Amino acid sequence: ETCFSENVADIISAHQWLADNYRTPQLLIGHSLGGAAALKAATSIKDLKAVATIGAPFDPAHAVLHFADRISEVDATGAVTLTLGGRDITISREFLEDLAETNPESYLPRLRKPLLILHSPIDQTVGIDNAQNIYRTTRYPKSLVTLNKADHLLTKPGTAAAAARMIATWSQQYLIPDTAPTGADVIPEGVAISRTTKAGRFTDVVRTGTHTLYTDRD
């Protein structure tokens, strides 16, 4: 059981943990209700370079209004489980009260990060008008790109890969690339270097000449 405000807080906490233990994330991507949470969280994370959303509702309450017939069960049972954005969410009275207090008009104008809004014009779960409202309410630089023929979960062949390519291409203009290794930092082909990170004594970072991997030795 969770609520929208807790989702936002989790994103902020995860960003801080990664910044403290590995490297500071530069790009925040969110889908559906997670996209709405990413938008609000981004207003509180100053180190972000860019934000991208996929099928995000303008008002988080919109995501549950699609299931209005089930929401009425909350009064009778206290909670109901719905599938939103491909995952099960328990909708309780507290969840609905939290959504009722969420006003995107109050925080979206404060988003000062480059924004990419991806949305399908035939999305039957979160309508394209949500993307238009997000675009209308946020500041530049911003871009709205339609994912033609895609469903809400991007399950049709090629749609998820297309969205990923769009985000990757668009974000390059804002992200700071890793410094290319030189001299002693270059790792020869066929060699891997492993070291324990400050994230914990069971966590290792393994580097090769082309990849960096994080492993758990527990």
Segments predicted by a language model, with ranges:
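Alpha/beta-hydrolase active-site loop
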Residues: 2-21
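Alpha/beta-hydrolase fold nucleophile elbow
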Residues: 21-32
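Hydrolase active-site cap/lid region
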Residues: 46-94
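Short beta-strand/loop motif that positions the catalytic acidic residue
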Residues: 111, 117-119, 123
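Short alpha-helix in the alpha/beta-hydrolase fold that links the catalytic acid
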Residues: 113, 127-136
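Catalytic histidine neighborhood in serine/cysteine hydrolases
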Residues: 138-153
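Catalytic histidine-centered segment of alpha/beta-hydrolase-like enzymes
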Residues: 150-162
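Extended beta-strand/beta-hairpin segments
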Residues: 170-218
